[in-house]
């Protein structure tokens, strides 16, 4: 029995020495077993290296083991594998159930127990205890020695969970840590290591559990060889805070203590001196780096070198772009192959997608050495979502996540139709279980009010889709509803998956992925079904005989699947390795690129993790409960990891870092950058900060066809119209693309885009008629939309593009609801033979409350019935509507105008016929619409007409908006009503005005207490109606008989000379009203003509305060951009009312 250290710095050839040593032992011809022990993640590469060194025949005597493989081999020999192995999934599922049962007993973690991730934390610390040979009993025995009460409470909580976990586990199962514990016990009976020679390589530290196994091996083997990455053996001190090899020296000390304890012979160590190191025989610069890194004082490298490069990038993209270019260049100029190169980073998640995108552009084959989580696999999503539907009462998210997996026999169009219906009507929970067909009102789509047959057909389709969705889930629900045993639930879920033919569909997907060269996906799906079955088996194993509901099962499934990762097999031999720095040790690399050499990434920021803080760990160590290292110790390990990473390459080393993140925030380079710059003072740092677009000036820009094509286009774009400025290199490149048919077509397409404009014209009038309908019927609000932007009108009313209707209370929904209640209230007064003068405030409140309640009773699916939140909204609506009707009553009492009509409709089946507008072509356009209220006041044979429009938002009358066609509605309605009234009566109808009535219950803000009547006065004044009024004091006084200088009802005031003040209101004489009527008709005719001649120009308006694009929903469609030729705003000039009146009069006189 003996031990021997094989030591030397990185690159000295320790692994190579071990392989050669094994080769020599084979040639010596003896009966000893030869074993190479390596970490689990390096076992595959170690086997490749061993076979390459000793040949296939040599493997009969020599073998590669990891601790896990060793356990399997020993158990096969002497037994010990009687208990069933439980993996991380089963372990965490069991822990979840234990935590769920005991959460109310916890002192510290009672709240945390409910949070996601707590199971993993507890699992990790239990694993840590086991690795450090701390049992629940040992933990309990040492509790009294802990003085810190907070730490003691933590230990009591964790100890209770640990004990319960171990009690349940030990009956029938073992986990990985228990496996190593049993291995240690069984090694005495094994002959595998009897008189064998063992080489332990690629380790830097061991856990106490692993030390115990090594001790048993040392006591049994002929000799144990242990490689140590360090420059000298000997004493150490923990005060040596700058010692790079401190973690390794601690390992050396622990091994020597074991040897001394067991009287094991310490043989002369093998010192592999670096002069130069085996790895760096071709690079003196890399040799100097490994010798000087973290050495104090260090010696400068006074020569220039191309073996080490530093690149300062603007951002992560230019980092990876530089690396990709250099890889291609290395293959071309340095005779390297892709398999000789690697890209590593301290944050692979951050760089992975970027590397994929850029490397694909450069046609660089790559393999990302990273296990994939399966929680995002579509099979797993389908399973979890199906169970979540039952656990979360058919929530929208779970239902449609289940449907969109693409694994069901449903068309995606049908799923979209169903989703739109569900979202629009707020369908959830028990509504999915309703045996009656859904009959919620379809308040979206292209249906007319009277199109009930088409609507019913659509409803039938939706219910048909719904039934297809429900049937399998309802069957599953009937089989497992209530509290059932875990075994039964898993069996029924398995049957459910088989009925959906998921195994067959997985096979079909594997074939499809292979046929389309998506080998990574084929590899993933070839493993997924076995994982699904394994998770169900683990649940049956640990929870099979326990009864629980869907919530527990759903959590158990998620926890189980979250523990699985799929290893990906490299699809080819010649490809660039992309890896995290922690997985790169055992590869032979000629060119290494380290991306993201920024502060916090390389080295990574060390922060306390898990249950225990650094202070907790130190106190536990003092009380004989040593567990994993604290952040200080981990910082030493991170420092050694940096050293190991920088010295793994044998020819070329490149470090890149970025100066900013995606948001443009500054990032700092790592200390590693400044360290290397100091060691290599003549090293010239490269950068692209001055030319963020790349390297377009020189031959290095010519790369793969895809990338060079983009560079060419960039050059042409920059020098458009100035060909003489283009480098001759790019002229040659241009010719190359012209000579290749595929690229020639693409070049034509891209160059054509330089002259792109988004102007659209429809010259075919037949198409226009198809778009807008054969019958020329339209609403005035649509014409106002056209006036704002013709293209916006075309998209909304021609193409009928609409936002997805959501189950929410939008401003239009709110306005419609309030209009409906006001109409019902007003008609109700008529039916009861009441007038507004008979109404008091209590009557208003009672009637409004009854009306709102009745409407909501008749519409049970209304969003206002959906929650307490909307109950509060309903109460506010009642107050607002009560305020509004009471204010209307006040207006009526103060004036002589009386309501003549409510919700007066213009249309084929309306109160009045459609408004007819004759075009120059002789065609007639019929305008439809609705007026909220028409008031009249009689004076002899004259009838004054006033129309009132209720608005839930703020709306003011602006003459300029009338002039530009943005505010035509009330004027054309007024014109039509005057015309119809003249036909109906013998007298004369005169416009008194058009007004906007604001539906609001404002809050009065004041710094002091004021009486109620003053509050009411302020509210009344804040809700004055505004609009265009007839410039006639007598008529105005009929609207407010109590008016003196100013009115509390309308925004108008009287000057000292008795005339109306124009500064306070918009006024028009009778003549001006007549001119406006003609102007509005003429404007409407012009707008209709433009619509029917196919004008769909992208010409939004713009004034000082806003523009037509401000709230436009279709900007992504029109792509309006003032930088595109022909894209200009229609500037709306700021004119006074006097100027506008002149323009209107001139227009009418033409």
Swiss-Prot record:
UniProt superkingdom: Bacteria
Note: Despite having conserved helicase domains, this subunit does not have helicase activity.
Organism: Clostridium kluyveri (strain NBRC 12016)
GO molecular function, one term: 4 iron, 4 sulfur cluster binding
InterPro entries (UniProt xref): ADDB_N, DNA_helicase_suAddB, P-loop_NTPase, PDDEXK-like_dom_sf, PDDEXK_AddAB-type
The protein's name: ATP-dependent helicase/deoxyribonuclease subunit B
Assembly and binders: Heterodimer of AddA and AddB.
GO biological process terms held by the UniProt record: double-strand break repair via homologous recombination
Cofactor binding notes: Binds 1 [4Fe-4S] cluster.
Any one Pfam family match given in the protein's UniProt record, by short name: PDDEXK_1
Residues annotated as binding [4Fe-4S] cluster: 789, 1109, 1112, 1118
Family the UniProt entry places it in: Belongs to the helicase family. AddB/RexB type 1 subfamily.
Keyword Nucleotide-binding: yes
Coiled-coil features, chain-numbered ranges: none
SUPFAM superfamilies: P-loop containing nucleoside triphosphate hydrolases
CC cofactor: Mg(2+); [4Fe-4S] cluster
Residues binding ATP, per UniProt: 8-15
EC numbers, comma separated: 3.1.-.-
Keywords: 4Fe-4S, ATP-binding, DNA damage, DNA repair, DNA-binding, Exonuclease, Helicase, Hydrolase, Iron, Iron-sulfur, Metal-binding, Nuclease, Nucleotide-binding
Function: The heterodimer acts as both an ATP-dependent DNA helicase and an ATP-dependent, dual-direction single-stranded exonuclease. Recognizes the chi site generating a DNA molecule suitable for the initiation of homologous recombination. The AddB subunit has 5' -> 3' nuclease activity but not helicase activity.
Keyword Cytoplasm found: no
